């Protein structure tokens, strides 16, 4: 039995009462929160280790509700100025094909270093390069070592609508030197591979790794494939996830919105999490709400690619579970939940011309308890409550940018940078303390970053991508 106690911190619990407890303690035993209280009212039990949280705010770990990890090695140049399909077919797919398993291992470690340093403890990795041999094994080995909580949502594509092909051919003319590649699979092959993946990895790493099926989009996956994913999720008591209405092509092809299309086939259910939802109207929001579908909003990525803004306030008003995802490492170019929270608040204030449309409290909920709800994991993570996993972060607000601070939620959402995250626990294990990562010691960090830079350059060269074009002011 291992015990740990965090003492004299300010707890932002995110429990159903949204209690904020000053000068409080949390007691952790074998990876779970077993007790908490206020020092003036109770005495914490003895512990093997005590973390002094004086001057710090203790929060549930941030939950990255939708992301693509490997593409972090494709950021920093080749994606800029590209719309969605241009970016997808001229950067993402060829870039991932040019990666080797050793590159994937470096990408995962780099991603986790940045994520943990911004307070992210859980990620929903939409693995769209799992088709390539060795990539899954390389990623899982690093996830197990690092200690983050991972939903490994294994994506699959089993059809390409002919109406998209002509558009793709035209876009390829922009980058003729880049090889066109396909990640299509036969439906039966995808089923077998995802089943084997789940059998091997679901519940491993002390229960931190989960495996979901992830049909890519309604236009890239057959109805048969989506029905199988839905049944798989039900039979194995997991979720399934899908990219929905990230571009307007889905509706053009179906002649109706993706939400309407899925409802026609009985594919909307409470185990489904959909990402993006940019090209949505009130009818689509109503359909998702009716079927208790969960949502992940990638607000920075959608803006980066010029796609648009999802109707998040309308979903929130209905009480839907909406989490925040940083999305691709190369369509955001950072893995910083605090930065994405700030952008989420600002863009919706601007779009709605309403300075109170999403409160900082709601934004913080979206990054924690609502993010957990969007993953169907709110019984285990997302709040500081007895019985839940000890995924906790300590923020030190004694920085110039967070001084003065009075309203905690507003300070975190609008003033913080991310470097205020001082200590991170996942399953009660300390994976960062005093900004020092357990899986990337300071004496190794510079050499590792140089290796990541070198590997990224080699990937772009193998894919014939131009990462540093001429200076362009317009």
Curated annotation (Swiss-Prot):
Pathway in which this enzyme or protein is active: Xenobiotic degradation; atrazine degradation; cyanurate from atrazine: step 1/3
Residues given in the record as Fe cation binding sites: 66, 68, 276, 327
Species lineage: Bacteria, Pseudomonadati, Pseudomonadota, Gammaproteobacteria, Pseudomonadales
Protein name per its UniProtKB record: Atrazine chlorohydrolase
Enzyme class, broadest EC rank: hydrolase
MF annotations from Gene Ontology: atrazine chlorohydrolase activity; hydrolase activity, acting on carbon-nitrogen (but not peptide) bonds; metal ion binding
Site (Major determinant of atrazine specificity): 84, 328, 331
Gene: atzA
Co-factor: note: Binds 1 Fe(2+) ion per subunit. In vitro can also use Co(2+) or Mn(2+).
Note: AtzA and melamine deaminase (TriA) from Acidovorax citrulli strain NRRL B-12227 are 98% identical but catalyze distinct biochemical reactions. Enzymes differ by only 9 amino acids. These 9 amino acid differences between TriA and AtzA represent a short evolutionary pathway connecting enzymes catalyzing physiologically relevant deamination and dehalogenation reactions, respectively. Potential evolutionary trajectories between AtzA and TriA have been constructed, and catalytic activities of the intermediates along those trajectories have been characterized.
Role noted for this protein: Hydrolytically dechlorinates atrazine to hydroxyatrazine. Also dechlorinates simazine and desethylatrazine, but is not active with terbutylazine or desethyldesisopropylatrazine. Has no deaminase activity with melamine.
EC number: 3.8.1.8
Keywords: Cytoplasm, Hydrolase, Iron, Metal-binding, Plasmid
InterPro entries per the UniProt record, alphabetical: Amidohydro-rel, Metal-dep_hydrolase_composite, Metal_Hydrolase, MTA/SAH_deaminase
Keyword Cytoplasm: yes
Subunit structure as annotated in this protein's UniProt entry: Homohexamer; trimer of dimers.
Pfam families assigned to the protein according to its UniProt record, in alphabetical order: Amidohydro_1
Catalytic activity: atrazine + H2O = hydroxyatrazine + chloride + H(+)
Compartments it resides in: Cytoplasm
GO CC, one annotated term: cytoplasm
Cofactor(s) needed: Fe(2+)
Presence of the UniProt keyword Hydrolase in the record: yes
Regulation: Atrazine dechlorination rates are reduced by aminoatrazine but dechlorination is not inhibited by either melanine or CAAT (2-chloro-4,6-diamino-s-triazine).
């Amino acid at each position: 039995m291992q015990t740990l106690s965090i003492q004299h911190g300010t707890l932002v619990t995110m429990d159903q009462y949204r209690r904020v407890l000053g000068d409080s303690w949390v007691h952790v035993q074998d990876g779970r929160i077993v007790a908490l209280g206020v020092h003036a009212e109770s005495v914490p039990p003895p512990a093997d280790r005590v973390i002094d949280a004086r001057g710090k705010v203790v929060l549930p770990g941030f939950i990255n509700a939708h992301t693509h990890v490997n593409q972090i090695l494709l950021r920093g140049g080749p994606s800029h100025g590209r719309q969605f399909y241009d970016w997808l077919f001229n950067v993402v797919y060829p870039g991932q094909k040019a990666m080797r398993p050793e590159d994937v291992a470096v990408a995962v470690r780099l991603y986790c270093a940045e994520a943990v340093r911004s307070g992210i403890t859980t990620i929903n990795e939409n693995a769209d390069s799992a088709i390539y041999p060795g990539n899954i094994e390389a990623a899982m080995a690093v996830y197990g070592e690092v200690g983050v909580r991972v939903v490994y949502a294994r994506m699959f594509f089993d059809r390409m609508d002919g109406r998209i092909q002509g558009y793709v051919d035209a876009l390829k003319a922009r980058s003729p030197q880049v090889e066109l590649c396909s990640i299509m699979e036969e439906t039966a092959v995808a089923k077998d591979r995802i089943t084997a993946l789940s059998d091997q990895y679901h519940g491993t790493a002390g229960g931190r790794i989960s495996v979901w099926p992830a049909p890519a989009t309604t236009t890239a996956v057959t109805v048969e494939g989506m029905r199988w994913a839905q049944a798989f999720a039900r039979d194995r008591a997991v979720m399934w996830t899908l990219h929905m209405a990230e571009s307007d092509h889905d509706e053009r092809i179906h002649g109706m919105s993706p939400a309407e299309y899925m409802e026609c086939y009985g594919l909307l259910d409470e185990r489904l999490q959909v990402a993006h939802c940019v090209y949505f109207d009130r009818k689509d929001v109503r359909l998702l709400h009716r079927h208790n579908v969960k949502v992940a909003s990638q607000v920075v990525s959608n803006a980066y690619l010029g796609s648009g803004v999802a109707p998040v306030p309308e979903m929130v008003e209905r009480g839907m579970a909406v989490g925040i995802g940083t999305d691709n490492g190369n369509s955001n170019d950072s893995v910083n939940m605090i930065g994405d929270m700030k952008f989420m608040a600002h863009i919706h204030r601007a779009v709605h011309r309403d300075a109170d449309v999403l409160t900082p409290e709601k934004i913080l909920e979206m990054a924690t308890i609502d993010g957990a709800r969007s993953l169907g994991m709110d019984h285990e993570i997302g709040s500081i409550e007895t019985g839940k996993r000890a995924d906790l972060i300590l923020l030190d607000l004694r920085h110039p940018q967070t001084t003065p601070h009075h309203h905690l939620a507003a300070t975190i959402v609008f003033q913080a940078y991310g470097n205020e995250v001082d200590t991170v626990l996942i399953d009660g294990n300390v994976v960062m303390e005093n900004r020092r990562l357990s899986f990337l010691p300071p004496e190794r960090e510079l050499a590792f970053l140089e290796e990541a830079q070198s590997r990224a350059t080699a990937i772009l060269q193998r894919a014939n991508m131009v990462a540093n074009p001429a200076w362009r002011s317009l």
